[in-house]
Swiss-Prot record:
Function description: Catalyzes the isomerization of the aminoaldose moiety of ProFAR to the aminoketose of PRFAR in the biosynthesis pathway for histidine and the isomerization of the aminoaldose PRA to the aminoketose CdRP in the biosynthsis pathway for tryptophan.
GO cellular component terms, semicolon-separated: cytoplasm
Gene that encodes it: priA
Family statement: Belongs to the HisA/HisF family.
UniProt effect for mutating R19A: No effect on activity toward PRA. No activity toward ProFAR
Keywords attached to this entry: Amino-acid biosynthesis, Aromatic amino acid biosynthesis, Cytoplasm, Histidine biosynthesis, Isomerase, Tryptophan biosynthesis
Cell division recorded as keyword: no
Protein name: Phosphoribosyl isomerase A
Catalytic activity field: 1-(5-phospho-beta-D-ribosyl)-5-[(5-phospho-beta-D-ribosylamino)methylideneamino]imidazole-4-carboxamide = 5-[(5-phospho-1-deoxy-D-ribulos-1-ylimino)methylamino]-1-(5-phospho-beta-D-ribosyl)imidazole-4-carboxamide; N-(5-phospho-beta-D-ribosyl)anthranilate = 1-(2-carboxyphenylamino)-1-deoxy-D-ribulose 5-phosphate
């Protein structure tokens, strides 16, 4: 069985590494320098970094220069997310040399553009599906974005290479991942799925790893690592 890829997260707000609860602005806990956090995960054995510009996602400015600095300082693979919704923001993201880019809100609001980007960039593009129930939520999670499975069907037809699935109700809560949601998304696509939100323990990671045969490829881990629920080394060992 192939192992679950782990993607420690560095979310950047106003120049700081932060974690949110339910992805809501105003719930930040700051963890200092994004570059230091990213380098610490790399030193601990991470093969991936999930790097998010929260200001860009929420439309409260951006941390573009800092995000580029962090991405370019990494020797490991970087998945870049947050506010990538037009040609300009996509070009800036790709220019960092990141391995792949997560489209979020843009996928909901400008479907024609997303189809074009998927056709042009293929495997460098993943689409973030931020879900509450079976409804997608766009732009920093404050808007309704339509039905999950209708959108998934459309993106499958357009050739989307990968999905990053977040259960907003679980994100930043340390309440455990939504395994049913992950199973349902995997059943609706033959593309790999990256799980995000709710991981609180090594058992949660083992449970997600149990879905690798169903199509789950990776798990983004944020608050549990920052809250020291377990170390990245322990997580890598538990899922190898």
């Amino acid at each position: 069985m192939s192992k679950l890829e782990l993607l420690p997260a560095v979310d950047v707000r106003d120049g700081q590494a932060v974690r949110l609860v339910h992805g809501e602005s105003g719930t930040e806990t700051s963890y200092g320098s994004p570059l230091e956090a990213a380098l610490a995960w790399q030193r601990s054995g991470a093969e991936w970094l999930h790097l998010v510009d929260l200001d860009a996602a929420f439309g409260t400015g951006d941390n573009r220069a800092l995000i580029a600095e962090v991405a370019q300082a990494m020797d490991i693979k970087v998945e870049l997310s947050g506010g990538i919704r037009d040609d300009d923001t996509l070009a800036a993201a790709l220019a960092t040399g990141c391995t792949r880019v997560n489209l979020g809100t843009a996928a909901l609001e400008t479907p024609e553009w997303v189809a074009k980007v998927i056709a042009e960039h293929g495997d460098k593009i993943a689409v973030g599906l931020d879900v509450r129930g079976t409804t997608l939520r766009g732009r920093g999670w404050t808007r309704d974005g339509g039905d999950l499975y209708e959108t998934l069907d459309r993106l499958n037809k357009e050739g989307c290479a990968r999905y990053v699935v977040t259960d907003i109700a679980k994100d930043g809560t340390l309440q455990g991942p939504n395994l049913e949601l992950l199973k349902n998304v995997c059943a609706a696509t033959d593309r790999p799925v990256v799980a995000s939100g709710g991981v609180s323990s090594l058992d949660d990671l083992r449970a997600i790893a149990g879905l690798v045969p169903a199509g789950v490829e990776g798990a983004i881990v944020g608050k549990a690592l920052y809250a020291k629920a377990f170390t990245l080394e322990e997580a890598l060992e538990a899922t190898s």
